[in-house]
């Protein structure tokens, strides 16, 4: 007769629903779950669904004031991971209503915000997300995309070439600009600020921007080609970041750069909107990604961070090189490279793609192969990445 009974209860009673048929509007997630010894996989999967949606550790009377059935995440399928002991892929469906429109920040806060510290789990990794068109349509996405960038630069049918200016720290702005000019004059399309170059005592950002702009215009005049330098606008505050982007626009240069993980998705999305409104291309560096994506059984796979960036906005993103790594790695990398570039990507577990993804004409992002590559890698790089890529040397 008691209408309400408190106490700890199993999550799987409410959140494990193997008979659930996913909706076209659901956000689907694939988690690699390693339960603690003695915790059944259904309970672990349901715990993930609960804690990343409407659940808390007990029943509360306010649950009766809403429709949990409408708002709860559901673990709808669990499968063991081949070759791994006590690891499972748990598939979770989230109703679209749980997420704020146009906010990657809110999406991640909900899906991966709390659940990774969960006691019932030894480890947890978000392997993939299916973003439904109903949600992706609430995002601007990349400021320009691959085709518009090629049209702006008048460069077709080949990868774009770039290099990072070294030594990355310690040069004066004048000498930095000299190096930029030599590289661009020598035939590169782009040069790049290193991700650590922001505005340090030995080279303040405004001086660097001026000397780099001078180098760009000189090289353009002498070669008759359009040149660019990724001016790093990353800063300690969003206001300062936008200030730097405004100055780049005033100089008339074609592209700025941002570290999207250290800078954060909120700042990145603001910058992407500014770039579209003002005709700037946006180059994205992924500093800090390995902190999140390197462990095989815990964290977030980079393909999820790549999808999130396509939604938040960027025209280029660093995506690894593949060169000299294992074959399997190559397939996985090509999987998320296609997720960045293509309109429609079929589910293909051999490439790590857990869901079919339809981007419905959201602009594509150019993958940037960067990090320890040199001229002898060229044949492999062009074969792996094809024409729609940026090969970033140095």
Swiss-Prot record:
Please state which protein family the record places this protein in. Answer: Belongs to the RuBisCO large chain family. Type I subfamily.
Q: Which domain of life is it from?
A: Eukaryota
Q: Pfam families this protein is in?
A: RuBisCO_large, RuBisCO_large_N
The uppermost taxa in this organism's lineage are: Eukaryota, Viridiplantae, Streptophyta, Embryophyta, Tracheophyta
The reactions it catalyses are: 2 (2R)-3-phosphoglycerate + 2 H(+) = D-ribulose 1,5-bisphosphate + CO2 + H2O; D-ribulose 1,5-bisphosphate + O2 = 2-phosphoglycolate + (2R)-3-phosphoglycerate + 2 H(+)
Gene Ontology cellular-component terms listed: chloroplast
Molecular functions (GO terms): magnesium ion binding; monooxygenase activity; ribulose-bisphosphate carboxylase activity
**CC cofactor note:** Binds 1 Mg(2+) ion per subunit.
* Modified residue annotations for N6,N6,N6-trimethyllysine: 5
Q: What does this protein do?
A: RuBisCO catalyzes two reactions: the carboxylation of D-ribulose 1,5-bisphosphate, the primary event in carbon dioxide fixation, as well as the oxidative fragmentation of the pentose substrate in the photorespiration process. Both reactions occur simultaneously and in competition at the same active site.
**Protein name as it appears in the record:** Ribulose bisphosphate carboxylase large chain
- The protein's site described by Transition state stabilizer is found at 325
Q: Identify the catalytic residues.
A: 166 (proton acceptor), 285 (proton acceptor)
Q: Where does substrate bind?
A: 114, 164, 168, 286, 318, 370
Q: Which residues bind Mg(2+)?
A: 192, 194-195
**The UniProt record lists the keyword Magnesium:** yes
Q: Give the cofactors, semicolon-separated.
A: Mg(2+)
Task: List the source organism.
Answer: Nelumbo lutea
- Protein keywords: Calvin cycle, Carbon dioxide fixation, Chloroplast, Disulfide bond, Lyase, Magnesium, Metal-binding, Methylation, Monooxygenase, Oxidoreductase, Photorespiration, Photosynthesis, Plastid
Q: What InterPro entries does this protein map onto? A: RuBisCO, RuBisCo_large_chain_AS, RuBisCO_lsu_C, RuBisCO_lsu_C_sf, RuBisCO_lsu_fd_N, RuBisCO_lsu_N_sf
Q: Which PANTHER family match?
A: RIBULOSE BISPHOSPHATE CARBOXYLASE, RIBULOSE BISPHOSPHATE CARBOXYLASE LARGE CHAIN
User: Its Gene Ontology biological processes?
Assistant: photorespiration; reductive pentose-phosphate cycle
- Which residues are annotated with the PTM N6-carboxylysine? 192
Chief location: plastid
Misc remark for this entry?
A: The basic functional RuBisCO is composed of a large chain homodimer in a 'head-to-tail' conformation. In form I RuBisCO this homodimer is arranged in a barrel-like tetramer with the small subunits forming a tetrameric 'cap' on each end of the 'barrel'.
């Amino acid at each position: 007769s008691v209408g309400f009974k408190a106490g700890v209860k199993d999550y799987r009673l409410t959140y494990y629903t193997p008979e659930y048929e996913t909706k076209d509007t659901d956000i689907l997630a694939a988690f690699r779950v390693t339960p603690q010894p003695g915790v059944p996989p259904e309970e672990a999967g349901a715990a993930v669904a609960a804690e990343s949606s409407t659940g808390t550790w007990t029943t509360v009377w306010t649950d009766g004031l809403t429709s949990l059935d409408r708002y709860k995440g559901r673990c709808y399928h669990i499968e063991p991971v081949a070759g791994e002991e006590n690891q499972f892929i748990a598939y979770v469906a989230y109703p679209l209503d749980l997420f704020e429109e146009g906010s990657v920040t809110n999406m991640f806060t909900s899906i991966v915000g709390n659940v990774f510290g969960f006691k019932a789990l030894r480890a947890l990794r978000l392997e993939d997300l299916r973003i439904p068109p109903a949600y992706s349509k609430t995002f601007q996405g990349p400021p320009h995309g691959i085709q518009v960038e090629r049209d702006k630069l008048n460069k077709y049918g080949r990868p774009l070439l770039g290099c990072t200016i070294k030594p990355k720290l310690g040069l004066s702005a004048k000498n930095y600009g000299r190096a930029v000019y030599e590289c661009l004059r020598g035939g590169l399309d782009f040069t790049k600020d290193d991700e650590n170059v922001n505005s340090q005592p030995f080279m303040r950002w405004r001086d660097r921007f001026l000397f780099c702009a001078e180098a760009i215009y000189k090289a353009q005049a002498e070669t008759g080609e359009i040149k660019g330098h990724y001016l790093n606008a990353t800063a300690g505050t969003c206001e300062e970041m936008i200030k730097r982007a405004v100055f780049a626009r005033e100089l008339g240069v074609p592209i700025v750069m941002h570290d999207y993980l250290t800078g954060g998705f909120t700042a990145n999305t603001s910058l992407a909107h500014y770039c579209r409104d003002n005709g700037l291309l946006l180059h994205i560096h992924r500093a800090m990604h390995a902190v999140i994506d390197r462990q095989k059984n815990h964290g977030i796979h980079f393909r999820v961070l790549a999808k999130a960036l396509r939604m938040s906005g960027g025209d280029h993103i660093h995506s690894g090189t593949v060169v000299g790594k294992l074959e399997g790695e190559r397939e996985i990398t090509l999987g998320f490279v296609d997720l960045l570039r293509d309109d429609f990507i079929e589910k293909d577990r051999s490439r790590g793609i857990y869901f079919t993804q339809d981007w419905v004409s959201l602009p594509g992002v150019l993958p940037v192969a960067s990090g320890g590559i040199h001229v002898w890698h060229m044949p492999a790089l062009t074969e792996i990445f094809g024409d729609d890529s940026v090969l970033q040397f140095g």
